[in-house]
Amino acid sequence: GLGDVYKRQDYEVQYSMTIDYVNRVLETNRDILDVYRICVPFRVTTCTSMYQSYWRPWDEQKKEAWVREMPKDAMKVDKFPFYNRKMWDYDFQIEFSRWLHLQKAARRTCCLVGIRTQESYNRWRTIYRGVKKQYKNCMWSTEIDENVYNLYPLYDWKTEDIWVANGKFGWDYNKLYDLYYQAGVSLDRQRVASPFISEAIESLALYKVIDPETWGKMIGRVNGIGFAGLYGNTHAAGRKSIRLPEGYTWKSFMEFLLSTLPEHTRNRYLAKLKTSIRFWKEKGGVLSDEVIQKLKDRNIPIQIGDNSNYKTEKKPVRMDYLDDIDIEEFREIPSYKRMCICILRNDHTCKYMGFALTKEENEMKSNALEKYKHIL
């Protein structure tokens, strides 16, 4: 038979309007859903601090600092035998899917994921990376284990599509979006995500205005929240408005920034930079014909390949790191300014540059954090 399971990983810190919306949806649909409301202290990346690269929602060791009380219907670590303290939130998602598949003795398990390729390069790559097993050759599917799949039915929806559908069908929605609109936040920047990750850092200061009670509790929850809330959307860490101090090149400014960091943090950035430089020299990143022409127009030395391992019409381009480049597709081009932005945003994983965590990096991070836990 068929069964509908609703899984929500509760990250403890959220706008009260978001929590109200989730509660409303769950209550309205309890007759058709088997609800798993998960409150587990897995590790979650944070970009608010140079010293704390992750935090744990619902960490029993910091119960006195919790931003809110745990929901009464919460499922805690004792319900999930696969959980361990080294686990990241995305690791938990995968292991939960496997566990549920076995618990239900299912023939096949499908996990619907609401990501859209428009949201970020990493989400675009989830769909189009071309090196994955699929369900019946549907490109918006990924096999994560035998007979266990992730499906991304909204992968090609634009932000405007969501609101057109909402207006047409009269769906309930998170009223936080109304406040975002009234605050002048553009549609494509209205994110309802964990407030400490890089994608949400620019809107972090809105907590002070929209949900001051939650903001007051957040200050003591994760290191660096106050700074990120003040400067996350200004020259100090802004992506578009960052300015180079007088007398520096972007490379020398990057070297200065690295010199101010703790050794283990600095080494992680240097490892990412080394990998990126080698990648662009030896393999090359894929760029559109339009971007390639912009590089040619600026007399930037490049080597263009014929094909790529990715399923894309873009061409692989090998090139050296630039100091800076003033084009709309700035994020796609390797530059020391791009690296500076990662450092200023406390983007420990260099997600802004298109990096994703590897298992080896997770292990290195675990070892480093264990070694330096007395100062974190």
Question: What is each model feature region?
Answer:
Residues 1-376:
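Nucleotide-activated chemistry modules centered on ATP-dependent adenylation/adenylyltransferase
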